[in-house]
C-alpha cells in the first residue's frame, strides 16, 4: 500500500438516493427505532428495493414495538423520493412493502449472550460471528482518512445540501462521484487527475447546464491547489440520468462496503455494517479498529496504520490482532500491538461500552461513509489513551 513512486489512487462515493443506500438507510432506521426503545435489541435487518417494492428480511429480537413499514416510508421520504411528478414509480407513499423479519436463532443467541451454555466454557458476551475486521487511518487529511474517499464524499454532501435547500430545482436524489488523486514520491496528495459526477436530474434540464453547475461545485469543494488545467471533469458521461434510484436499479443492504469505509485504500473484512446491532462484530469491531488506528496515527506512531482483528463465534476475546504501518511507523509494530492490550479492549461487551454503542446513532452512519462524522464516538479521540500511546515514542 505504501509506495515509493508517484501513483494515482481513485475512490468513489454514492449519494443518499442510490438504491443500495436507500436499502442501507431503511435497515439502519429500523435498527435505531429498536435501540431507541430497547438498547438490548438484537437486529439483523436486510432491505431490498426495486421498482415500486420494498422487502425487509432478517432477524429481530427486541422488546421494542415498532412499525417497520412506517419507518421505511419515512426513510424514503427523508431521502427525497416523495415528488409526485418525478417519482411516479418509487415513491414513499405508494411503494409496496413486504416484512419478512423473524426472531434470532436461539443457537446464535446462546453464543452471544453473557451467560453459560453447553460447550461455551464461559459466561461473557461472545462475538456474534466469526470473521475478520479492519480499521485504517492516514495523516494525509485532517479526517485521518485517504484523500480520494474524503473528496468523493464531500462532493456528494454538497450536492445533497444544495438539492435539499432548493438551490436548483432539477437535482434528484440518486448520484455518484469518483475522484482520482495523484500521489508524489513521499506518498502525499499532489494533484487531482480527474473527477466524475453522475447526478440524477429532471427531464427539463440540458446537459450543458448540469455540466457547468457540477464543475463549479467541484471547484468550490475540492482543494484549489490540487486542481489545475490538467484536471479532467466527467459530468453525467452517459448524457442523461432521469430514471434513477430503485426505479432504475435494484438496491440491497450492504453492497457499498468500500464506500462505507476507506474507498479501497484500506482492507475490508467483507462484513457489511448497516442494519446490524453492536453485538455483531462485523460492525462494532470495524468501528473499534478504526478508533484504535486513528489513535495510533494521531499519537504520531505512524503516518499510516491498518489494524486487523479476528473472532470466533461465541468467544469474547479476538483470536488475533495485527498492526501494519506500511513502513511509516516511528516504533516497532510489535511494540504497538503489545501496548494495545493494556490501552484498549476488543471484547464485544467492552467495545460496546468504550464506544457507547447501544444508542440509536446508526442512521447518522449510513450516508457518506461511516468514518466522516466527527460526532460519532469512534471518530473522537480519547486524550488518556492518546497520551498512553505517545509514551511509546519516549
Swiss-Prot record:
Lineage top rank: taxon: Bacteria
Places the protein is found: Cytoplasm
Residue positions binding L-methionine: 59, 104, 249, 280
Cellular-component GO terms for this entry: cytoplasm
Catalytic activity: L-methionine + ATP + H2O = S-adenosyl-L-methionine + phosphate + diphosphate
InterPro entries, A to Z: ADOMET_SYNTHASE_CS, S-AdoMet_synt_C, S-AdoMet_synt_central, S-AdoMet_synt_N, S-AdoMet_synthetase, S-AdoMet_synthetase_sfam
UniProt entry keywords in alphabetical sequence: ATP-binding, Cytoplasm, Magnesium, Metal-binding, Nucleotide-binding, One-carbon metabolism, Potassium, Transferase
Pfam family for this entry, one: S-AdoMet_synt_C
Keyword set includes Metal-binding: yes
Positions contributing to Mg(2+) binding: 20
Enzyme class name: transferase
Biological processes, Gene Ontology terms: one-carbon metabolic process; S-adenosylmethionine biosynthetic process
GO molecular function, one term: magnesium ion binding
Residues covered by region (Flexible loop): 104-114
Cofactor comment: Binds 2 divalent ions per subunit.
Cofactors named for this entry: Mg(2+); K(+)
Enzyme Commission designation: 2.5.1.6
Signal peptide per UniProt: none
Entry binding sites for ATP: 18, 174-176, 240-241, 249, 255-256, 272, 276
UniProt cross-references to Gene3D superfamilies, sorted A to Z: 3.30.300.10
PANTHER family per UniProt: S-ADENOSYLMETHIONINE SYNTHETASE (PTHR11964)
Binding partners and assembly: Homotetramer; dimer of dimers.
UniProt similarity note: Belongs to the AdoMet synthase family.
Protein function: Catalyzes the formation of S-adenosylmethionine (AdoMet) from methionine and ATP. The overall synthetic reaction is composed of two sequential steps, AdoMet formation and the subsequent tripolyphosphate hydrolysis which occurs prior to release of AdoMet from the enzyme.
Name of this protein: S-adenosylmethionine synthase
Native source organism of the sequence: Akkermansia muciniphila (strain ATCC BAA-835 / DSM 22959 / JCM 33894 / BCRC 81048 / CCUG 64013 / CIP 107961 / Muc)
Biological classification of the source: Bacteria, Pseudomonadati, Verrucomicrobiota, Verrucomicrobiia, Verrucomicrobiales
